């Protein structure tokens, strides 16, 4: 509830459960905001030009979606920077980190790719943003000259590498080169861990049998491909004594391997995504009760992503366990969608009317639904605490990726917030794609019932989402680029061999 009056602060928020670190501060807490920054947190009333009464709902830091793909050249039917970030404030997200990509294995100029991406993003973002970079050819020019330049001048302190996909796949030796370089620079390494040879081997066998419907995407990328690659990249990380983040983890076995490393104080971090908590491979099948258009035999293509949706609820429960016990460090969307009904989108997988999963662009939409899904199905059901939720969606991404002004509610931090309805205050609803703000013609979570949704989203002290009074208040020029520092999560253990010094 909004009110206006005279006061010393630009905005005051009060009467909510304020989630700060491991604590939940009582509704008697007042937060005073001035110049886009949190200036005071008080147990006594504060006055402001604008007042938000949270009416007993949770007040949390603005969400950080640290794994999104926007305006990528290889996905012409995907979300642009403008359409993708438009969906961030309505879902409680105030900062996203998409990827600038090395254009090809022959391209030695990563700096130009970043500068080009800056041009794409400028005045096209509804929320704040930073950049990761994807490296597909770790030559000396990039590792010794360009990465230091990007870290120092652009504040880019994270690199993603792949063990799969022909365009991006690196050898173990190349991964080691990057890990050693990133250790020296204090850069976070993100790794997509799947065994490419296993995937290629099974894919050939499926093609020989003409098994190419969307469902066979999940068969072609079995859990063992993720399990083996996870063990391998952890071994490489230990050899160089450098932390890594393994992205979009879906396998309980792979997550147990991460847990074992963590229990031995090895700094291995894990990310998972909504699809690995809520969707199974049944959605990929020719006929599925969850499909919106049950008469469309190709609808399963909407759910193609990698790693793929897993086979059973038990496997999803294993990922939930890793969320609950602290194995998972960050919860991201891996928003990488393409329009379904488009010849360059998901329908690219229909060749002369014959489905072929290998030709379907990978990826699902998810920026807007990420935080509401975990809040409704995690916090409100008691599967996780509000504090754990904030760790996963806000504070840990900020720490891991060097967003020093984001991710927590504290004096001096950016005034980024998401405010939820008090439990039971909002009428439940069933999601349809028409309710969302992205540029994609479907959501994998259509048909899911939501019991809560962000009531307000606030970015640097400005209300950018007011669900009850005006909806989206941000514009495409609202977002600002955020230069990042190094990770503040646990780092190297000091065990680097003299060979690599």
Question: For each predicted feature, which ranges?
Answer:
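Alpha-helix-loop-beta-strand connector modules within alpha/beta enzyme cores
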Residues: 110-127, 177-191
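C-terminal cap of metal-dependent C-N hydrolases
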Residues: 16, 344-362, 411-482
